[in-house]
């Protein structure tokens, strides 16, 4: 909530490139699902099918409060689940879509603007809580992991695969590594210590 808006940045990147894939970090709940379905499908069309969504339910209460979002952790994931149901229903429909859920309700949503990709824009997802794993099992095309010790990554993948299998799904997996670069090795290690402290502070919240 304190950085440039992701969809606008993604539109600029897509317009300035021809082959680069665009992974848009997208938080459900800010924009109504039918409007979001049209906006994202439009961006996928204009980028010639280069868009993917990193769906972020939100893990920092202070950050979410800046945008007026006060749902607690598990309720955010319940909303995300419903939001993704709605998006996928609109993107894959052959006619107007009605939806009556706990968080979203609409009638006659038009699927006229479709994503370039079929059956829909790829959905990336992450999160280690039970609530996050449940949503990932139902919706994630690719489940994202941080670079952690091998045993932890293996255990996480097994957990997600088991949950997805129960839903008849088999997602892909990605692992992200973020190198710390500085002018000197000493400066890089100093920066690494600062990052570690930030991570510890965030986990303690």
Regions found by a protein language model. Give the residues of each.
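Active-site-adjacent structural elements that line small-molecule/cofactor binding pockets in enzymes
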Residues: 1-205
């Amino acid at each position: 909530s304190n950085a440039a808006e992701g969809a606008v940045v993604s539109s600029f990147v897509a317009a300035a490139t021809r082959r680069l894939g665009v992974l848009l970090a997208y938080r459900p709940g800010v924009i109504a699902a039918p409007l979001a379905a049209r906006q994202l499908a439009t961006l996928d069309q204009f980028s010639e099918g280069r868009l993917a969504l990193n769906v972020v339910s939100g893990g920092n209460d202070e950050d979410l409060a800046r945008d007026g979002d006060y749902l607690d952790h598990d309720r955010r994931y319940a909303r995300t689940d419903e939001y993704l149901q709605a998006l996928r229903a609109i993107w894959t429909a052959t006619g107007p879509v009605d939806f009556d859920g706990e968080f979203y309700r609409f009638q006659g949503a038009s699927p006229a603007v479709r994503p370039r990709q079929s059956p829909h824009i790829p959905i990336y997802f992450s999160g280690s809580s039970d609530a996050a794993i449940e949503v990932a099992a139902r919706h994630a095309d690719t489940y994202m992991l941080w670079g952690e010790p091998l045993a932890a990554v293996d255990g996480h993948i097994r957990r997600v695969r088991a949950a997805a299998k129960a839903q008849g799904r088999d997602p892909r997996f990605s692992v992200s590594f973020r190198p710390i670069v500085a002018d000197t090795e000493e400066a890089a290690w100093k920066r690494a210590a600062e990052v570690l402290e930030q991570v510890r502070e965030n986990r303690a919240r």
